[in-house]
């Protein structure tokens, strides 16, 4: 159980179960139906909640004095988050993974640091331009391998799979 912000689990990737989920103290204060009602829908379909898609989540506070400024993670479908996190939903899974790849780059991080902004609200995140067509299969393979380790990401792997991944080396 988490009681302090310093309470972390030491994890060995080799021994984690395939369906591992990190622990959390977050519990919605409403029932499941109300939570679903409060969940926003994607802009391209008023009947699909954002939680039906893999999303790219960002720590809202930009760490201007830290080693990394823009901190992001890929959320699998079905997961929500608290208001200190912002997330973007993409129509196509490869766009989400591609944007995640750019967000881990030194170039994007430097840009975010150079703005001096304290928070990464959705309007700021939408300013970040990413030329998806310039990414190589290696970028996609590495982003998926570093972010999507459990069965919760199986659908994302299927949607983004490229046979070129088989020839990638580290």
Locate each region found by the language model.
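S-adenosyl-L-methionine
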Residues: 1-170
């Amino acid at each position: 159980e988490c009681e302090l912000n310093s309470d972390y689990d030491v994890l060995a990737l080799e021994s984690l179960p395939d369906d591992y989920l990190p622990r959390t103290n977050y519990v919605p204060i409403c029932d499941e139906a109300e939570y679903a009602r409060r969940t926003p829908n994607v802009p391209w379909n008023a009947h699909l909640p954002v939680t039906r898609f893999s999303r790219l989540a960002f720590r809202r506070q930009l760490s201007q004095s830290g080693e990394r400024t823009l901190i992001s993670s890929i959320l699998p479908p079905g997961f929500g988050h608290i208001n200190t996190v912002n997330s973007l939903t993409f129509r196509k899974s490869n766009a989400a993974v591609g944007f995640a790849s750019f967000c881990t780059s030194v170039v994007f991080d430097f840009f975010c640091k150079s703005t001096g902004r304290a928070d990464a609200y959705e309007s700021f995140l939408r300013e970040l331009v990413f030329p998806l067509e310039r990414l190589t299969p290696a970028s996609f393979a590495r982003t998926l391998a570093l972010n999507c380790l459990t069965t919760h990401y199986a659908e994302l792997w299927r949607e983004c799979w490229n046979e070129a991944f088989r020839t990638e080396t580290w």
